[in-house]
A protein has these predicted regions:
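Small-residue-biased structural context
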Residues: 1-176
Length: 176
């Protein structure tokens, strides 16, 4: 079964992404900041601008992703607040090997759930990033770059939720 799952592109991508990240928590937090936080900050403003352009130019077409630019603007703000909380509070505490991280980690997981909901809204507005047959270059670029952004954000969330956070969450041992 494992061999079969590893043959699937998505399963292979997930395994590869988490296998290639540092396992040491301090190194992992620096990796997340340098790789994911920097990339999100670089990518999102361009995506907002491109979405606004596509919406304005193609506002008379039925497939136009109406409201996408606004969704992305909201995401810029939400992600910036989330990343700042990690960079200023959670990650420094992790680097100090602080205890009692359950509360900030729970807050970060809740933010991750909110980000997943935002991704679903984006997919709904874009019909799962399905381009119309006559899509222009800007529209095509928007969906291509948006797909890459979503993959990066999902990887970012997965690495924090599945690799980083479990190292600091208290384990509840049940007597059986």
């Amino acid at each position: 079964l494992k061999d079969f799952l590893l043959q699937l592109p998505e399963a292979d991508a997930m395994t590869t992404k988490t296998d290639r990240v540092p396992q040491n928590p301090a190194e992992l937090t620096r990796f997340i900041e340098a790789h994911y936080h920097a990339k999100h900050r670089a990518d999102l403003p361009f995506l907002v601008e491109l979405a606004a352009k596509v919406e304005a130019v193609h506002n008379d077409q039925p497939d136009v992703p109406a409201g996408l630019a606004e969704l992305l603007r909201e995401m810029v703000g939400d992600l910036e607040v989330h990343m700042k909380k990690e960079e200023l509070i959670l990650f420094p505490a992790i680097r100090r090997s602080a205890e009692e991280l359950d509360v900030p980690i729970t807050a970060m997981r809740e933010d991750h759930d909110d980000h997943a909901e935002q991704i679903e809204k984006i997919k709904n507005v874009t019909a799962n990033l399905t381009l119309p047959e006559d899509a222009c270059r800007s529209w095509t670029r928007l969906y291509t770059d948006l797909s890459a952004f979503i993959c990066d954000l999902e990887d970012h969330i997965r690495i924090e939720n599945d690799v980083l956070f479990p190292q600091f969450e208290k384990r509840v041992v049940l007597d059986v």
